[in-house]
């Protein structure tokens, strides 16, 4: 990401920060720990070229060094406590994951490396191969940033068949697969998933209960991107109830403050009819009246639930500021 991309991202993130805040404290209350790791430097990455179509380009010599370094750091932190290793269909994530898989295998760890297509980068479509520091690079970012703020029906400018709903279904499906494979393990199992910058950052902000836009804004200012090569984003919890633990090494408070809590309440409220509407749209395309009826019933239930939960969530958040009493 270069200067123009940074300008756009900072503008949008700063707008979000007008209504959110953070407070210290973190508590362990999750079902699994999921450590997302961005790939090391790839050939197109180093050249500043948008590269989202698998398999993409391989790692550079620098990227290979980064992969070895992050493998040692992850093994040092989790040891043989890693329940599962995952990567995307992109060559750069597979080559980044390989050193960790090799080190774990050498130490007698039985976890195998599994490839999940849902961990692929957000498709750039018509902008594939363009410079990241270009108008096309800026347009590529607009829809994903909108999804992070709750406007999930905004289509990917480069590929209108992709929107926040389809992206969340795809990446979230991969996360669901990871969760189902390890949630029954003893204690709080840890999984490591190698993916790409945009996919990790956007899906995390869309799904955690404590999205910290200030951390992301700081990242953009310092690195001109959402996450540096081999940067890590750690979340904890279960599908539908994820908490952001740390972002590129910066601890994130579990209690994000009233502003962020109200933002999440509103995000959940406005997303429900969008997801429901897209389900109905897909059902219409199927041509099946049974599928359509099921989609409509599910949509009504989803929207009713969101409408009922919104005032309760807002009330709980507000009284929480006063220690649970008014």
Model region roles, listed by residue range:
Residues 2-10, 15-25:
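C-terminal segment of classical bacterial N-terminal signal peptides
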Residues 28-30, 123-132, 205-326:
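Acidic, low-complexity terminal tails and accessory targeting/binding regions
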Residues 29-115, 229:
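Active-site-proximal alpha-helix that buttresses catalytic centers in soluble enzyme cores
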Residues 33-41, 86, 185-199:
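Beta-strand elements within well-structured catalytic alpha/beta cores of enzymes
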Residues 40-44, 90-93, 119-123, 197-201, ...:
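Solvent-exposed loop/turn segments at secondary-structure junctions
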Residues 58, 103-173:
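Phosphate-handling substructures
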Residues 67-71, 94-97, 168, 172-176, ...:
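Extracytoplasmic/secreted envelope proteins and their assembly/folding machinery
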Residues 72-80, 98-106, 176-184, 205-209, ...:
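Sec-exported extracytoplasmic/periplasmic mature domains
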